[in-house]
Amino acid sequence: MSEAEKQAVSFACQRCLQPIVLDEQLEKISVHAMAELSLPIYGDNGNTLDPQDASSFDHFVPPYRLTDSINGTGFMLVSDGRDNKKMSAAFKLKAELFDCLSSNSEIDHPLCEECADSMLEIMDRELRIAEDEWDVYKAYLDELEQQRVAPNVEALDKELDELKRSEQQLLSELKELKKEEQSLNDAIAEEEQEREELHEQEESYWREYTKHRRELMLTEDDKRSLECQIAYSKQQLDKLRDTNIFNITFHIWHAGHFGTINNFRLGRLPSVSVDWSEINAAWGQTVLLLSALARKIGLTFERYRVVPFGNHSYVEVLGENRELPLYGSGGFKFFWDTKFDAAMVAFLDCLTQFQKEVEKRDTEFLLPYKMEKGKIIDPSTGNSYSIKIQFNSEEQWTKALKFMLTNLKWGLAWVSSQFVSP
């Protein structure tokens, strides 16, 4: 490609960015033609910059000029890329020409033939729209000119006087209205103040209401809680009224050949060796039961006083200051000691005294087993069983103790029936 062809394709269309070939006549443009092209297309309309818009002038961006670019940025250069410092005079002339055209119109130059035709069509369309608008304005102006008539001065003066009188009347009415407005404003202020006071009273009322409502809710909660507690207490009271304290505290039953009190076996068998600590505990519970029953009916034993002392309970002989132990430890020496037997006989005597006291109060009361002189008699067989352990078999002794506990259970049942509230 020749040098001339390279320079002929040095610009691009500013719309489609396609490379364009310039007409050769642009090479021969004169200085006078350049000067004329530099003149603005539109004359100065005499408008000055509005002070309010002065701040926006700082953000004004002038149109891009080809000559302001060092390397021709903004145009597509398809030449051999030589340094811009060596740009030919013809290229600079063309660049200045396009800058002049761009600064005097809203369209950036150069344009290719197709884009120029497209822009001409757009401008023709805008021109036709402007001409149509001008025709409309011209017709309206002609109509206004035809309607213009000579003014009637007298009628206008009369109308002016009427307007002045109307103005005075309106001013007077306005003054009255202002007074009325002031009066209404004062009334509104008073009403507003009263409203504020009522609002404060309402707020105070609601605070008091909320406070009392909360206290009421707490009181109702306390009331419901107390009602629940009372109901529970009544339930427990009814349950306690129906409950026999003696039956709960002293459970007399049997386990095979043994009589038991609170699950402690009273007695021994050759085949069942009951530990003496269990026998002593059973005697302690038995003494405690008889003592409680006697105290309940107000009975004081003659000759003896039963003393509950756990597994070391005893019977005190009144007048002799002597204690008869109701506990033992076994062994050869124990079986030859008569104090344990004497204590059991004394206890049986106290139980007999309790029986007689109950029979005085209730003639129909009768124990299932008769007791006399340290023995218990089975009415079904007529056999008597000694409560002593000396010179007695363990079977006989255990059966006597079982019968004794049975009699004691009957006495417990009678006392419970007499002293339990209906």
UniProtKB/Swiss-Prot annotation:
Any one Gene Ontology BP term: late endosome to vacuole transport
GO molecular function terms attached to this record: phosphatidylinositol 3-kinase binding; protein-macromolecule adaptor activity; small GTPase binding
Coiled-coil residues: 119-243
GO-annotated cellular components: phagophore assembly site; phosphatidylinositol 3-kinase complex, class III, type I; phosphatidylinositol 3-kinase complex, class III, type II
Keywords of this entry: Coiled coil
Keyword set includes Coiled coil: yes
InterPro entries tied to this protein: Atg6/Beclin (IPR007243), Atg6/Beclin_C_sf (IPR038274), Atg6/beclin_CC (IPR041691), Atg6_BARA (IPR040455)
Disordered as annotated region, ranges: 182-201
Top-level taxon of the source organism: Eukaryota
Pfam families: APG6, APG6_N
PANTHER family linked: BECLIN 1, BECLIN-1
Main function: Plays a central role in autophagy.
SUBUNIT field: Interacts with Rab18, preferentially binding to the GTP-bound form.
Family in the record: Belongs to the beclin family.
Protein name: Beclin-1-like protein
Source organism: Drosophila melanogaster
